[in-house]
Amino acid sequence: MKSTRKSATQRRHRRLRRHLSGTSERPRLAVFRSNDHIYAQVIDDVAQHTLAAASTLDPDLKKSLSSTATQEASAEVGKLVAQRAIAKGINQVVFDRGGKLYHGRVKALAEAAREAGLNF
């Protein structure tokens, strides 16, 4: 069977998730990137509960963004998810890049979240 980019991403994500798990003390910051948007969630895997979330589809962000598929938009999502997590008392997270390479939009989101106060 021919290996496609999507199947390679899914394989990488399965490999990553074997070792990554979020707890209530240190939840998982999960990132999903599509061609048009980027989504970030802070997840407690033990309780199976989403604690904070942000995306380029948020009404707060969508108005101020000229394009949702840029590194600048990803950085804004990173700042917003970090602010929402810190408001709920979450400072430490485990970063889950979702099988994507740590480059470009995923990297921009992670660095913006770090600058906003999340530790990972």
Swiss-Prot record:
GO BP annotation list: translation
Bias kind Basic residues: ranges: 1-20
Positions of region (Disordered): 1-26
One Gene Ontology cellular component annotation held by this UniProt entry: cytosolic large ribosomal subunit
MF terms (GO), sorted A to Z: 5S rRNA binding; structural constituent of ribosome
Highest taxon above the source species: Bacteria
InterPro entries: Ribosomal_uL18_bac-type, Ribosomal_uL18_bac/euk
Keywords: Ribonucleoprotein, Ribosomal protein, RNA-binding, rRNA-binding
The family this protein is said to belong to: Belongs to the universal ribosomal protein uL18 family.
Biological role stated in the UniProt entry: This is one of the proteins that bind and probably mediate the attachment of the 5S RNA into the large ribosomal subunit, where it forms part of the central protuberance.
Subunit details: Part of the 50S ribosomal subunit; part of the 5S rRNA/L5/L18/L25 subcomplex. Contacts the 5S and 23S rRNAs.
PANTHER family, per database record: 39S RIBOSOMAL PROTEIN L18, MITOCHONDRIAL, LARGE RIBOSOMAL SUBUNIT PROTEIN UL18M
Protein name: Large ribosomal subunit protein uL18
Originating organism: Synechocystis sp. (strain ATCC 27184 / PCC 6803 / Kazusa)
